[in-house]
Regions:
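Short amphipathic alpha-helical segments
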Residues: 24-25, 186
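A glycine-biased structural micro-motif
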Residues: 12-13, 96
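Short, surface-exposed loop/turn motifs at beta-strand boundaries within globular domains
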Residues: 9, 23, 38-40, 181-182
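Hydrophobic packing positions in regular secondary-structure scaffolds
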Residues: 18, 57-58, 63-73, 77-96, ...
């Protein structure tokens, strides 16, 4: 049996009639409860009757069709309509507003909303994000349903913004956003308005690690914008989960009077790393490096080295290369993780590493850093002190972000009407 489907645009301003067909008023909005499952059920209608806005419960509706809503009985509750907690009005709160197309990792605007009768109730099942939705709302009802093809998104693949909805218990849900890569979420934040971006950040805050990853992916302007509104303790919580190099860059952009209070709230180890990085010019090797890296004794066996890699707390992107040092802790070699995995487990690192790897001192400028990375086709470049001890590593992606145009990785807008 084919599922009954309606579009919100075809219901708005429809006649509201009693069981006998007598006109009572008109439909002003459709009310749903977002918290109830993947496809939220219609809980009722907002109707305009005799100069008043009334609530019509879903259980009172016998017929719901384009242009006409018929009640199961003759009586209405003539109490004024009042929004209840967790309720959303589809016309007022969703239609014409932006939402997140999670499947496409971009913003879109709701041009129309599709309802279907399923499991004993009318439910929101889809959103039309095409530019033709507004046109359909302006056409006569009999023509609107036959307008050009729609771009319909499954409701389960979208997340509406609800920060503007006057209800104290409504929040954007974290579950759908957690499906996205931090860089995709950052793209959404940067394409959104400030309030929309703040709503995304608040939702992502349910996972502190993900929140920090998203902050790392934001451009500096947006990082400062959203950190500025947080207390010192809240700012420190975000910075504590970020890489020390990213945390130092962001901390340097905070107001002078906030830097030390926020820095003092960081865990001691992170605090020490950040203080060290802040002592370097941000456009030099010292300012670009990440103080978290893996440098092992060249006398170590491959089998033991692999165990160290597994135990390492470094992020996967920081573990592309393992460096080695001699008995005096002087940099002696470099080896790609892929080569380490394929090596004889009993071999010593000294026998398989690339000897005398390229390195730079902290005062090397950005052009020199970029030149060494490109000339030697490196993904990671060690930074050494005067004694040739490794003090940090520069990743190629950190340099790319500086030498390419600001929006180089955002070739496609995160906002689209599909």
């Amino acid at each position: 049996m084919e599922m009954a489907v309606l579009h919100l645009s075809m219901l708005l301003r429809s006649k509201l009639v009693d069981r006998g067909g007598e006109n009572l008023g008109r439909v002003e909005d459709v009310i749903v409860r977002l918290s109830d499952g993947a496809y939220p059920p219609v809980t009722g209608l907002k109707a305009h009757v005799a100069g008043r806005d009334l609530f019509v419960a879903a259980k009172m509706i016998a017929v719901l069709e384009p242009g006409r809503v018929q009640l199961a009985g003759d009586q209405l509750n003539f109490g004024r309509f009042e929004r209840r907690r967790s309720e959303v009005l589809l016309r007022q709160d969703v239609l014409g507003h932006r939402l997140i197309n999670v499947a496409g990792a971009r913003l879109a605007r709701a041009s129309d909303i599709e309802l279907a009768f399923n499991e004993g109730a009318w439910r929101v099942v889809g959103v039309d994000v095409s530019l033709r939705g507004p046109l359909r709302r302006r056409l006569p009802r009999q023509l609107g349903g036959r307008s050009a093809a729609r771009t319909l998104l499954d409701w389960e693949s979208v997340e509406p913004f609800v920060g503007h909805v006057p209800s104290s218990r409504l929040r954007m849900r974290f579950g759908k956003l957690s499906q996205l890569h931090p860089a995709q979420i950052a793209d959404l934040v940067e394409a959104a308005t400030h309030d929309e971006g703040e709503e995304i950040i608040r939702a992502v805050g349910a996972d502190r690690e993900l929140e920090a990853d998203v902050f790392e992916e934001l451009d500096l302007e947006h990082q400062v914008e959203f950190l500025h509104q947080r207390s010192d303790a809240e700012a420190a919580n975000v910075l504590a989960k970020m890489g020390a190099d990213d945390a130092a860059d962001l901390l340097a952009e905070l107001e002078q009077e906030r830097r030390e209070p926020v820095l003092s709230l960081l865990p001691k180890t992170q605090q020490r790393k950040v203080r060290t990085l802040l002592g370097f010019n941000p456009s030099t090797a010292g300012g670009l490096m990440n103080p978290d890296f893996l440098c092992l004794s060249e006398r170590m066996a491959v089998k033991r080295a692999l165990e160290e890699v597994k135990r390492s707390a470094l992020e996967p992107e920081q573990l592309t290369v393992v460096f080695t040092h001699d008995s005096k802790k002087i940099l002696s070699g470099a080896l790609a993780i892929a080569a380490l995995v394929c090596a004889d487990p009993e071999a010593r690192l000294a026998d398989i590493v690339q000897r005398r790897p390229v390195s730079l001192h902290p005062d090397a400028d950005l052009p020199e850093v970029a030149r060494e990375l490109t000339d030697f086709n490196l993904t990671a470049l060690p930074v050494v002190d005067e004694e040739e001890h490794v003090i940090g590593v520069i990743a190629v992606d950190d340099v790319l972000e500086l030498i390419f145009p600001e929006d180089w990785r955002r070739r496609f807008s995160a906002f689209s009407n599909e």
